[in-house]
UniProtKB/Swiss-Prot annotation:
It comes from Fusobacterium nucleatum subsp. nucleatum (strain ATCC 25586 / DSM 15643 / BCRC 10681 / CIP 101130 / JCM 8532 / KCTC 2640 / LMG 13131 / VPI 4355). The keyword Protein biosynthesis applies. NCBIfam families: trpS. It is found in: Cytoplasm. This is Tryptophan--tRNA ligase. A motif ('HIGH' region) lies at residues 10-18. ATP binds at residues 9-11, 17-18, 144-146, 184, 191-195.
Length: 325
């Protein structure tokens, strides 16, 4: 079975855009791939500076993924910082990675353009990411179409290492393009993102979830008049309902005497119904945090066993003789 690997940054609360853009597909993939999913807490240090927030987010993400169906008996769920070999391999790869390659990274340039202070962690982020992927001999990496450059950089770094040392040591991972054709709109119409503060969080309290749904921006068409059925409410509603339900909502918009508030209520009910089982499961998991921590610890032990063997061989290839683990 081919190995699939993906990292999830604990940089904030997950939302329905994350779910349909990645989480749901990770769950669907776990029956056909040997899935490795890690909490990328080292990576999050490039943007998170509050220790308590990082700790809280880390466990929240594990809770979210377990609640939506990621199964520890099928997938390896682990914590990046529990496997120090990631950072050890990062140093080996840093010494064969051109600075120019890192400076050309889209993500790096975008963050600098947004005024995020440049630091070494931000610049060398792709090297750590390459180490994350290569240390497990990953066959595929699930990515969105706009993230392909990240994986291309990993492949470039792997090829550079292999060529420099005359070996075929690192496997060149292939992209597994996620179906992101239906980009989830946020409450303001832009792509749903924590950065835009326009998210709908599926595990929020019912009160908070209602506030988020009711904040969806609409036009000022009066209640009695027909409305454009191709609006943000309808687009989000389509994620949770079949075509018949979607057409019913469309007909209501076109008929008039159906307000955006009515549509938002229907959307809220759809979200609560769709995530009903997951919300209940998450509540139960929160009462058993020892289990959640055990999942992370056991997954980390399994991941580290693999990582140690890979780093031992990598150190031997470059001429380092220290191999005590």
């Amino acid at each position: 079975m081919k190995r699939s690997l993906s990292g999830i940054q604990p940089s904030g609360i997950l939302h329905i855009g994350n779910y349909f853009g990645a989480m749901k597909q990770f769950v669907d993939l776990q029956d056909s791939y040997d899935g490795f999913y890690f909490i990328a807490d080292y990576h999050s240090l490039t943007s998170l500076t509050k220790a308590e927030t990082l700790k809280e987010n880390t466990y929240n993400i594990v809770l979210d993924y377990l609640a939506v169906g990621l199964d520890p008996s099928k997938s390896t769920i682990f914590l990046q910082s529990n496997v120090p070999e990631h950072t050890e391999l990062t140093w080996l790869l840093s010494n064969i990675t051109p600075v120019g390659l890192l400076e050309r990274g889209h993500s790096y340039k975008d963050k600098i353009a947004k005024g995020i202070p440049s630091n070494t962690g931000l610049l060398t982020y792709p090297v750590l990411m390459a180490a994350d992927i290569l240390i497990y001999d990953s066959d595929v990496v699930p990515v969105g179409k706009d993230q392909k450059q990240h994986l291309e950089m990993t492949r470039d770094i792997a090829m550079k290492f292999n060529q420099q040392y005359g070996v075929e040591f690192f496997k060149l991972p292939e992209p597994l393009i996620l179906d992101d054709s239906a980009i989830v709109p946020g409450t303001d119409g832009q792509k749903m993102s924590k950065s835009y503060n326009n998210t709908i969080n599926m595990f929020a309290t019912k009160k908070k979830l209602k506030e988020q749904v009711m904040s969806i921006v609409t036009d000022s068409t009066p209640l009695e008049e027909p409305k454009n059925p191709d609006n943000n409410i309808a687009k989000i509603y389509a994620l949770f309902n079949n075509i018949d339900k979607q057409n019913e909502l469309k007909d209501k918009f076109l008929a008039g005497n159906f307000g955006y508030g009515h549509a938002k209520t229907e959307l809220l009910n759809s979200i609560l119904e769709y995530f009903g089982t997951a919300r209940e499961k998450r509540e139960e998991l929160e009462k058993n945090m020892d289990y959640v921590k055990d999942v992370l610890n056991e997954g980390s032990k399994k991941a580290r066993t693999i990582a140690i063997e890979k780093i031992k061989k990598a150190k031997e290839i470059v001429g380092l003789v220290g191999n005590i683990y």
